[in-house]
């Protein structure tokens, strides 16, 4: 959720909405028509789904925008659905080991978000550069950018892995872990931090595929990684069949095996190049300081953007940890379920980012803007339905994962309160991805600093501790902060400076 900039409606100065019978509808803003969306005819929808799953070679800078978004978004959404299924299954199995095991996962992942942030920042840079080169019809330049991104990710992973393995127990202690959590969680944390290369490479290579428009390949990579993870997880956690019962440590081992396999498969597709737009050849395998420096500059603000957003979760977790393991466990369960809804939405957002990058590369900024509003509308429809379900069915959903009376109420509160902002999140997630796809990573970075650190964390502490709202104060702060970020993002997006960014 960090880094998204949710918004429920376009800016308030629009004058009306005109519907057409095509695959789009138009929103009249200050006398200018901006296409938003209207679901395509059912026949066209299913043919688009088939095209998307097969792996389309279409030119996303030409033709109907609705069709292009559909073909890009379907594999991205299915990719994220699989990631969501893994997130829920993982916490489902770990929850059977007790609240301390769930708290271990929650605390470890709150620190892993820093690694995710680096991976996201590098992925933002890789997607923007590859998409722009593909839009310019420079496939050789796209391959060169891909090699520099992978090299940068590998070097980063080595440094982070060494630090994480050595410092894991101290890091958990700084996060407020209890003695029991430290006893069972230190090995889990070491394995997860040491295996961070699988996270970085999986993020990066799939970002390259998405930027190129090869969303179906990225989908297959993540499905493979998570299928292995889901199958192997319970075997290593509970000792099924010939496998040893490793407890929470088994979950970490299964995760790294699954992600590592996916990363190797993805790299093989880049090198083989049989069906991918980006084909890495032998002459590309060299460091190019000029290309890498452009990538570093682009990724640095993207990484900072993600770090600011995800690191603020650590501040929220620190506040929640003062209320005990039950609160942490409930929050972890609730957030994992929320991820189930938001990750598919990130699929739609990624589709919008790819459309923006390629359209700007083809010198079609109006097409880029139309694609963003259309993707946002689809996202709003989806998250609106999911938000209602979470509010109404929060307790039955929480009971799927645990019946512990010390945990369930906090999971229910997490689901209900954060889901209230889903309509806001919908457009904002797409807007945030659009800025990044255009290479304008600094705008979301500044917004994240203001909203998450100067607004959300102080507000969370005020509500939870000073005004005695308890954990609910933290959940409210999340929803309020994202709503604020949404409105600010919409204003800046309308100004259109992102259209002039060079990558």
Question: What do these predicted ranges mean?
Answer:
Residues 71, 93-113, 179-187, 248-249, ...:
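Interfacial/gating helices of multi-pass transporter permease domains
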Residues 77, 81-103, 170-179, 235-246, ...:
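Helix-terminus/linker motif at the lipid-water interface of multi-pass membrane proteins
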Residues 82, 86, 115, 119, ...:
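Residue-level hotspots within pore-lining transmembrane alpha-helices
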Residues 102-162, 199-218, 330-394, 425-447:
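Small-residue-rich hydrophobic transmembrane alpha-helices
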